[in-house]
């Protein structure tokens, strides 16, 4: 993952907590204040608003410091998390789940296949959000196999999914996700319709992209697929 800079005012809007930030073909989401740098950050006093919200004070977003021309003091930076974590190669269609363990400082996700010549991986177009504000990756393995009664063990591997789209097409209606292990496939057309995910048993896991699995809470909010660049994903 590379380091990028934004103005502090932009962290209020348009890149506030939960907003998607696209840069150089990568997609990130701004983490909440629980991930901010401890006691750092200028305290701001707005007494009337503090009273209205029943809080003690406000804090300005922290700004990072550089040790030198190459090293950045992460203690002061505002964290962003890669989101969505499901990516695909535009050349071969290979899908890959890019979790934290795969992140390397100042490196971008690339396709490992020789014929793709280190092609940068592209984030999937759709993500999932519930009516109570939780945002997650869509479980594409579940989506692909939702019409099948069983799957083999190979279907559970991250490297068995493939994103297919007709040449020169930018419409979701012409795109499919397929499993190389068992041959199952399903079109993305209609995925953003109400009940499209809940009707096949996909539920909210009650956490945000920057939270670990042990932070999951029980949530009965109805989930829906939304394009990651859509304004209603944030506002």
Segments (PLM) and residue ranges:
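Extended, Lys/Arg-rich, non-catalytic nucleic-acid recognition/anchoring regions
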Residues: 1-235
